Regions:
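Extended active-site neighborhood of metal-dependent phosphoesterases/phosphodiesterases
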Residues: 82, 89-91, 100-120, 177-268, ...
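Core catalytic region of metal-dependent phosphoesterases/phosphodiesterases
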Residues: 146-206, 305
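Active-site neighborhood of phospho(di)ester-bond hydrolases with catalytic His/Asp-centered motifs
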Residues: 133-135, 164-170, 196-202, 245, ...
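An acidic-aromatic substrate-binding cleft motif
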Residues: 112-168, 173
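Gram-positive cell-envelope targeting signals
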Residues: 1-26, 455, 459-474
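Active-site environment of divalent metal-dependent phosphoester hydrolases
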Residues: 139-143, 172-177, 202-208, 249-252, ...
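Acidic, histidine-bearing metal-coordination/catalytic regions of metal-dependent phosphoesterases
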Residues: 10, 18-133, 138, 389, ...
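Active-site-proximal segments of metal-dependent phosphoesterases and phosphodiesterases across multiple
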Residues: 270-311, 323, 329-332
Length: 474
C-alpha cells in the first residue's frame, strides 16, 4: 500500500512538472499575424503569411466554402526567423475565379492550426469590384489600435460585400513586435477574412529594413527591391491597380517608374488606379518636403502620360480630394445624373485627368490643412479638411462604366458614422493597348545612370525654386 501511494505521488509530481512545459509548447506553436495577399494572378493565386513564437511547420489548407477543410490538400511553404519570431509563408496558385474560399494555416504534424479564415477571388470577366480603403492606422498602444479597429468594423458593416481591403501604409508606428501583435490582434476580423492589399508606408520602410516584406507575402515585381517595401500590380474586375513603394530609393527609383510605365501600358482595363503612401496632391504638412517635391516632379508627368484615373495615397493624416487634374491644372468635366445600384448618383463624365484622393487616417493621429501648401494643390482641391473628430474609411464600387467613391468618418465619442465626401466617374469611352509601346528596362544595372542624372536635375530644380522664393520674400 505504501509503495503504491509513493508511486502515485511520483506520477503526480512528474505530471505537475511536465504539463506546464506541454502547455508552453502548445502556446509557442500558436499561430498569429495571419494575412492573405495578392501573389500572382488575383483570380487564381494567393500568398499567406503568419507568425509563430517557436519553430513550427508551414502548412496551409484551402477549400471552397462548404467543403470539408480538414480534408483539403496540404500546401507547404517556407519559414525563417525575423524579429525574434518565426515568419511563415506559403502560396496557393490553383484557385478558381469568382469563388469564395475558406482556409487555415499552421502545422499539420502537430495539429496546431489558426482559426478558419475566408477570402474571395474575382472573376475573369470584367465584372463589378467592391473594396474598402483606409490609411495610416499608425498606432503605438492597444487603446489606439482598438479605436482604429472600430473604424474598420464600421467599414465592414457599411460594405459587407467588399472583396478586398487596401491599406495605404503606416499600419504601425515603430514596427515593434508589440505593435504588430496589437495590430493583427485587433484587425483579425478583416485581415483573416479578406484579401489585404498592403502599401508600404514610411513607418514600415525608413530604417525598418525588410519588415514590410516580413509581414506580408506579396508577389513583388521582378526587379522590386524589398528592403523598404515592394511594388506590385493586380487586376480586379475591370480595374488595374499598381501599388507603388514611395520608400524606394528616395524619392523613387528609375526602375520603379519604368516598371509603372510598362505595367500600365500592358493593361487593357477600363480603370487604371495607383495606390501609394506619400501623396502627390495633399494639403498636409509633408507636401513641401524636398523628397516629396522631387517625387512629385518625377511622377506627375508619368501619371498624366499613362491616363491614370485615380491615385489613392496616405501619409498626411488629413482629408483631401482633388478635381480631375492634368498638367497641374483642373480639367472641368461635364456631369450626368442617373440611378446606379439603386441610388441617384451624379457622375463626372469622361474626365480628362486624374483624381487624387487622400482619405485621412483610420487612426487617432490627425493633422489639419496646411494653408502654405503649393498653390496648384490648394487650387485643385474639391475638398480639403481635417478629421479631428474621428477616423476615416472609404468604399469604392466599380464596373466597366462606373466608379463610385464614398468617404465616411466615425465619431470617436459616439461611434456614429457620417458621410463626408462622395465622388463618381462615368466612362463611355475605352482606350486600347498601345501596340507600339516597347518595354523600358527595369533592372538596377540598366537604370542606375538614369537614376543619378534625374536626381541631380531635380535637386538643381529645387535649389533654383528655393532661391527664387528667397528673393521674392526679401
Amino acid at each position: 500500500m505504501k509503495k503504491s501511494f509513493v508511486k502515485i505521488i511520483s506520477i503526480l509530481l512528474v505530471l505537475c512538472m511536465t504539463l506546464p512545459i506541454m502547455a508552453s509548447a502548445m502556446v509557442a506553436g500558436e499561430v498569429s499575424r495571419v494575412s492573405v495577399t495578392i501573389n500572382g494572378d488575383s483570380a487564381t493565386a494567393r500568398g499567406f503569411c503568419w507568425y509563430t513564437d517557436e519553430k513550427a511547420g508551414t502548412d496551409v489548407q484551402v477549400a471552397v466554402v462548404g467543403a470539408d477543410l480538414t480534408k483539403a490538400a496540404i500546401v507547404s511553404g517556407v519559414s525563417y526567423k525575423a524579429m525574434e519570431k518565426y515568419v511563415h509563408k506559403a502560396e496557393v496558385d490553383t484557385l478558381k475565379p469568382n469563388t469564395r474560399y475558406q482556409y487555415r494555416v499552421g502545422d499539420s504534424k502537430t495539429g496546431v492550426w489558426s482559426d478558419v479564415g475566408y477570402f474571395t477571388t474575382p472573376g475573369k470577366s470584367k465584372d463589378e469590384a467592391n473594396f474598402i480603403v483606409f490609411a495610416d492606422v499608425q498606432a503605438s498602444n492597444e487603446e489606439n489600435f482598438q479605436q482604429a479597429a472600430k473604424v474598420l468594423q464600421s467599414a465592414v458593416e457599411t460594405m459587407p460585400n467588399y472583396e478586398f481591403a487596401v491599406g495605404l501604409g503606416d499600419f504601425v508606428n515603430d514596427c515593434t513586435n508589440e505593435e504588430w501583435d496589437s495590430y493583427f490582434r485587433n484587425f483579425s476580423f478583416m485581415n483573416m477574412n479578406t484579401t489585404l492589399v498592403p502599401v508600404a508606408g514610411n513607418h514600415e520602410g525608413n530604417l525598418q529594413w525588410f519588415k514590410f516584406n516580413n509581414m506580408f507575402n506579396i508577389g513583388a515585381a521582378e526587379d522590386s527591391m524589398t528592403v523598404t517595401g515592394c511594388y506590385y500590380s493586380f487586376d480586379w474586375g475591370d480595374a488595374h491597380f499598381a501599388v507603388l513603394n514611395s520608400n524606394d530609393m528616395y524619392p523613387m527609383s528609375a526602375s520603379q517608374i519604368n516598371w509603372l510605365k510598362n505595367d500600365m501600358n500592358s493593361s487593357d482595363a477600363q480603370w487604371k488606379i495607383v495606390l501609394m503612401h506619400r501623396a502627390l496632391y495633399s494639403a498636409g504638412k509633408n507636401i513641401n518636403k524636398p523628397d516629396t517635391v522631387i517625387m512629385r516632379n518625377l511622377l506627375l508627368p508619368v501619371i498624366d502620360e499613362l491616363g491614370i484615373d485615380v491615385v489613392f495615397a496616405g501619409h498626411d493624416h488629413m482629408y483631401m480630394r482633388t478635381e480631375p487634374v492634368k498638367g497641374e491644372k483642373v480639367q472641368v468635366a461635364s456631369t450626368v445624373t442617373e440611378y446606379w445600384n439603386g441610388e441617384s448618383t451624379t457622375f463626372a463624365l469622361n474626365p480628362d485627368g486624374t483624381t487624387h484622393i487622400l482619405p485621412s487616417t483610420a487612426g487617432t493621429k490627425r493633422y489639419g490643412v496646411n494653408e502654405d501648401a503649393m498653390p496648384p494643390i490648394l487650387e485643385s482641391s474639391a475638398l480639403a479638411r481635417d478629421t479631428k473628430d474621428g477616423g476615416v474609411f472609404a468604399t469604392v464600387s466599380l464596373d466597366s462604366n462606373h466608379f463610385v467613391y464614398k468617404a465616411y468618418m466615425v465619431d470617436d465619442e459616439t461611434g456614429e458614422k457620417s458621410l463626408i465626401d462622395t465622388y463618381a466617374i462615368k466612362k463611355t469611352d475605352r482606350e486600347s493597348i498601345n501596340e507600339d509601346y516597347e518595354d523600358l528596362p527595369t533592372d538596377i544595372g540598366s537604370t542606375v545612370n538614369q537614376q543619378g542624372i534625374t536626381l541631380v536635375i531635380e535637386l538643381l530644380k529645387m535649389l533654383v525654386s528655393y532661391i527664387k522664393l528667397l528673393f521674392s520674400v526679401i
